[in-house]
């Protein structure tokens, strides 16, 4: 906002005192457009920040306790092994997480583009707040995906000003429920004792899960290796929103690393088949 005011004052001085005012005006126009875009992106992001702040205040009022081996006894053996491998036993139960991503994505048949994102998940009442800044054709395209109160919305705007996509509805709710459960499996395995999950054993290296959040019901099959690592998550309940078509969705994991004494996924992919 300060930059916008400065440009306006500069333009007044240019018009009043400079014979070749058009050259200064062009420079001011460029600065003004950049300042407006920066302000618009910050304003667009403010809803994300406000939502995060609100959920953090609720979470802080919730007392925590430890996740023990007794808590995981009802889970299928490969899921128990995964939780032990992850290092979450005898640690505080997870109430929320913050995830920062650097990556690339693309729509089917289109070119890759880079993105950076910040994401908060809250697990007592499943919530996912995901803010992304993508760069397409040299332009910044921010997007806010939120899943709150069992309802999902996606809002993408060029420079935070011009609508590119706005999606909501039953398909969006179901698709984001898959994403929320995928986050639980990959990013917060301690939450896999959640009572909303119904586990179905398959064999020593795979298990099926049904996850229900209100009217949103999804399922997925989790695949593990002999070490206990979760190596893939496959669901047939994920939609590609811009097409509103249901595709098989998988997230193969190819690398783990140790962070604060826990084995955490370090590299993975999200694939629509």
Language model regions located:
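N-terminal leader/targeting segments and the immediate start of mature chains
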Residues: 48-98
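Hydrophobic membrane-insertion alpha-helices, especially the h-region
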Residues: 29-39
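Gly/Pro-enriched, hydrophobic low-complexity segments
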Residues: 208-273
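Membrane-helix boundary connector in multi-pass membrane proteins
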Residues: 9-25
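Central hydrophobic cores of alpha-helical transmembrane segments
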Residues: 2-10, 27-29
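N-terminal mature ectodomain segment of secretory-pathway/periplasmic proteins
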Residues: 80-161
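Flexible, processing/modification-adjacent segments and terminal tails
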Residues: 156-213, 244
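Hydrophobic alpha-helical transmembrane segments in integral membrane proteins
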Residues: 39-50
